[in-house]
């Protein structure tokens, strides 16, 4: 028994079916079937854990609010206290290219509501949930906040985001870097041929818009694949590759293309067929006068064929040495990718 049979003879899904949700950039259901019995639970659980814990994303690390020394303060004219504001800031969804850290600023006067859409971003930082409410200002109130944004993975508690040399007034924020918000999966029986107990894995995924659900699963699968490589302690035997020797031709390989593959009108195609013109090599050797002597073949059909040939860099009245070759049907099959 060859070692490849350990994995080559297991059934695998033909493709991943993606069912978009109301917002395809955030919601989707992915279905993989058929899987060997037990593999649905194995893969579903592993992918779910990776999706929630290991994908890279961006989040707010800390915030500085003008006039505020610590998170247990209150701000005149602002209805929420600083603790509630910080909790709202934690929910800001961000997409960012590069590592960071980068800065964002919001400055607003009341009355009104400060939302994530009021934040002034720079460069490649994008706020994904602009409708998120951060705080509410009374008439005459003013607030200015500066955010530090960085990239990371998983969840990082606020205390770990506090630098050792943190200046007074810098408030660390819990950072939820993962772009995946929710993942659920279920495993059902599915049929393949006469076998009824294969697995069908259905995963429902919600992201913050920083990555599509389909891409999130692809990244998670790649992480899992990379982690498993260390357990493979052998190299697969290499397959012998036989290279087909293609003979040199004395003419353009395009001459081996059949005329019925050209986009011709029915009338023109029938005229060529009735005149036993099968290949382009047969056609280009004909002169205009010869073509016009073909029954039911008129000037309109002639112009059509001349135009099609011109698009291929060919014309009527060409000399084709060595035409027709003895094994023309075999050559046409071997050269079909060369014209």
From Swiss-Prot:
Chain's gene name: rpoA
Record NCBIfam families: PRK05182.1-2 (NF003513), PRK05182.2-5 (NF003519), rpoA (TIGR02027)
Region of interest called Alpha N-terminal domain (alpha-NTD), as start-end residue ranges on this chain: 1-235
Known partners and oligomeric status: Homodimer. The RNAP catalytic core consists of 2 alpha, 1 beta, 1 beta' and 1 omega subunit. When a sigma factor is associated with the core the holoenzyme is formed, which can initiate transcription.
Pfam families, sorted: RNA_pol_A_bac, RNA_pol_A_CTD, RNA_pol_L
Nucleotidyltransferase keyword on record: yes
Catalysis: reaction(s): RNA(n) + a ribonucleoside 5'-triphosphate = RNA(n+1) + diphosphate
UniProt region (Alpha C-terminal domain (alpha-CTD)), positions on chain: 251-339
Alphabetized Gene3D superfamilies for the sequence: 5' to 3' exonuclease, C-terminal subdomain (1.10.150.20), DNA-directed RNA polymerase, insert domain (2.170.120.12), RNA polymerase, RBP11-like subunit (3.30.1360.10)
The name this protein goes by in its record: DNA-directed RNA polymerase subunit alpha
């Amino acid at each position: 028994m060859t070692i490849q049979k350990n994995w080559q003879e297991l059934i695998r899904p033909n493709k991943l079916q993606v069912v978009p949700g109301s917002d395809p950039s955030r919601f989707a259901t992915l279905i993989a079937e058929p899987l060997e019995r037990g593999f649905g639970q194995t893969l579903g659980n592993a992918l779910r854990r990776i999706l929630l814990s290991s994908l890279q994303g961006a989040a707010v690390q800390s915030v500085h609010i003008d006039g505020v020394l610590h998170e247990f303060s209150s701000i005149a004219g602002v209805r929420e206290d600083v603790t509630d504001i910080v909790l709202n800031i934690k929910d800001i969804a961000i997409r960012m290219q590069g590592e960071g850290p980068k800065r964002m600023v919001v400055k607003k006067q009341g009355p009104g509501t400060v939302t994530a859409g009021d934040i002034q971003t720079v460069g490649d930082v994008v706020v994904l949930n602009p409708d998120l409410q951060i705080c509410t200002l009374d008439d005459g109130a003013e607030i200015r906040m500066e955010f530090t944004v960085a990239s990371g993975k998983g969840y990082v508690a606020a205390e770990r985001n506090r630098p050792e040399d943190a200046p007074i007034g810098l408030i660390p924020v819990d950072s939820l870097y993962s772009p995946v918000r929710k993942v659920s999966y279920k495993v059902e029986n599915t049929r393949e041929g006469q076998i009824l107990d294969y697995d069908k894995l259905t995963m429902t995924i919600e992201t913050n818009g920083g990555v599509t659900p389909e891409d999130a699963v692809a990244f998670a699968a790649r992480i899992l694949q990379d982690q498993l490589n260390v357990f493979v302690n052998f190299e697969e035997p290499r397959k012998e590759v036989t290279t087909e020797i293609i003979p040199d031709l004395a003419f353009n390989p395009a001459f081996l293309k059949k005329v019925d593959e050209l986009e011709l009108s029915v009338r023109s195609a029938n005229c060529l067929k009735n005149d036993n013109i099968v290949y382009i090599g047969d056609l280009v050797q004909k002169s205009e006068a010869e073509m016009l002597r073909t029954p039911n073949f008129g000037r309109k059909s002639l112009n059509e064929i001349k135009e099609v040939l011109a698009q291929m860099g060919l014309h009527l009245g060409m000399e084709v040495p060595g035409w027709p070759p003895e094994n023309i049907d075999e050559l046409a099959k071997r050269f079909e990718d060369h014209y």
